[in-house]
């Protein structure tokens, strides 16, 4: 279960929800098994070598092409979310848009996020921290909004509906400012009670 058991610190709960929602966990498990296999070939980029070795192995055992592509992609990209979340400006929308282009599905993004978590948390006790988790989660959310087709236009359509549902209880300006500070998905999924 990737160390995401029942008694979980609050900073890991979002990752647990991602894991629980995966449609094909076995693809993540294969990526976890294969992600560092390219290290056996010294002197080369282990992510690229690992992708090639993974593709060859998974084709040989007869997995469907779609699955082979997903797992090979995860192996190739297994360092990218860690690198981007810790070394790039997550407020750079162009960078997020460019990063999002490589994902065919939201499922591939979810699996890459979980692979990144597992890879970092499995290295040493100090490789993972709540801060790194927050950065990784922020990158995931911003990228998922692009991959899933969420954009400013959708947020602009969702916010008035939420404001209308809350206008009796909370001033419009307060609700709007709060919703615009949250991920776009929040305004689309949460309704006033």
Language model region names:
Residues 1-52, 56, 62:
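Acidic/His-rich, divalent-metal-binding segments that scaffold phosphate/diphosphate chemistry
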Residues 9-14, 43-52, 68-73, 86-87, ...:
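Composition- and surface-driven signal marking solvent-exposed, interaction-prone regions
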Residues 10, 16, 38-39, 45-46, ...:
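Short leucine-rich amphipathic alpha-helices used at interfaces
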Residues 28-35, 48-56, 69, 73, ...:
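Feature representing long, continuous alpha-helical segments
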Residues 39, 43, 56-63, 77-85, ...:
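Short, well-ordered loop/turn and helix-capping segments at boundaries between secondary-structure elements
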Residues 59-117:
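Acidic/histidine-rich catalytic neighborhood
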Residues 94, 98-193:
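Regulatory modules associated with amino-acid/nitrogen control
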């Amino acid at each position: 279960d990737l160390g995401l058991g029942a008694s979980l610190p609050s900073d890991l709960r979002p990752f647990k929800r991602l894991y629980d929602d995966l449609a094909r966990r076995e693809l993540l498990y294969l990526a976890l098994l294969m992600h560092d296999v390219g290290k056996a070939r010294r002197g080369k980029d282990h992510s690229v070598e690992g992708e090639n070795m993974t593709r060859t192995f998974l084709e040989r055992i007869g997995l469907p092409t779609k699955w082979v592509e997903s797992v090979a992609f995860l192996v190739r990209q297994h360092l990218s979310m860690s690198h981007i979340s810790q070394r790039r400006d997550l407020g750079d929308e162009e960078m997020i848009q460019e990063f999002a282009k490589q994902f065919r599905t939201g499922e591939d993004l979810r699996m890459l996020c979980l692979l990144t978590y597992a890879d970092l948390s499995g290295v040493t006790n100090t490789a993972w921290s709540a801060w790194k988790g927050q950065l990784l989660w922020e990158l995931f959310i911003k990228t998922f909004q692009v991959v899933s087709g969420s954009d400013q236009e959708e947020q602009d359509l969702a916010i008035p509906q939420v404001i209308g549902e809350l206008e009796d209880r909370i001033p419009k300006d307060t609700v709007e400012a709060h919703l615009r500070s949250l991920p776009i998905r929040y305004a689309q999924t949460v309704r006033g009670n």
